[in-house]
Amino acid sequence: MALPDFSMRQLLEAGVHFGHQTHRWNPKMKPYIFGDRNNIHIIDLAQTVPMLSRALQVVSDTVARGGRVLFVGTKRQASEIIADSAKRSAQYYVNSRWLGGMMTNWKTISNSIQRLRKLDEILNGEAQGFTKKERLNLEREREKLDKALGGIRDMGGTPDLMFIIDTNKEKIAIDEAKRLGIPVVAIIDSNCDPDLIDYPIPGNDDASRAIALYCELISRAAIDGIARQQSSSGRDLGASSEVPVEPALEEAAEG
């Protein structure tokens, strides 16, 4: 295993270089702007490439030492990709809505996760003694909890690293990470504040193909970390009952 490769051409084909309209920019992004075209800022991919490479190394290193990575992306075009990428790399995700206190009030969140597990036990069993209406209410409660917490139910504590799509939309998540000292890898579009992020990656945070490419690369970096961890512990990855699947990067670029 090795860190995933990517090329400038893949970034271009995914539209990573397209920022927002020039009047919407955050002036702090000036160092990462190449120029503008038709009143759209163009992000300097010559900087994106090394910054993305550094972020991938951080993800791999975090997982290699047994750390947990939390993928966060609740916007419509990121939601499904975030969940799939986290699951594929045995990591965790929030893709519905960030609940205030999700990290800073972990004890309360843990209680809700316990409730979700209890509901699973009840509803996966015979659920005897419940009326049809009571069962329906329990199913609705489970569905609501699973939507909010399903991606972190097995995390077992706060993560060691967070990967975020759209820092403006996920500002509460970033604030909580800062309070707890959790480092953040994030995509920073032309309207974002790079100062908030430990490992910023300049790029478009709206285009589905760009989001798919970022998530695929981060996921594969995490898989690389898993392989490194198992190698250092003397485990033979090929002999494992569950070998992480490494999908083709090109599929993400085409998605």
Swiss-Prot record:
The keyword Nucleotide-binding does not apply. The keyword Ribonucleoprotein applies. Keywords: Ribonucleoprotein, Ribosomal protein. One of its GO terms (cellular component) is cytosolic small ribosomal subunit. SUPFAM superfamilies: Ribosomal protein S2. Residues 230-255 are annotated as: Disordered. One of its GO terms (molecular function) is structural constituent of ribosome. GO terms for biological process: translation. InterPro entries: Ribosomal_uS2 (IPR001865), Ribosomal_uS2_bac/mit/plastid (IPR005706), Ribosomal_uS2_CS (IPR018130), Ribosomal_uS2_flav_dom_sf (IPR023591). HAMAP family: Ribosomal_uS2_B. NCBIfam families: rpsB_bact. Belongs to the universal ribosomal protein uS2 family. This is Small ribosomal subunit protein uS2. It comes from Rhizobium leguminosarum bv. trifolii (strain WSM2304). The lineage of its organism: Bacteria, Pseudomonadati, Pseudomonadota, Alphaproteobacteria, Hyphomicrobiales. The gene is rpsB.
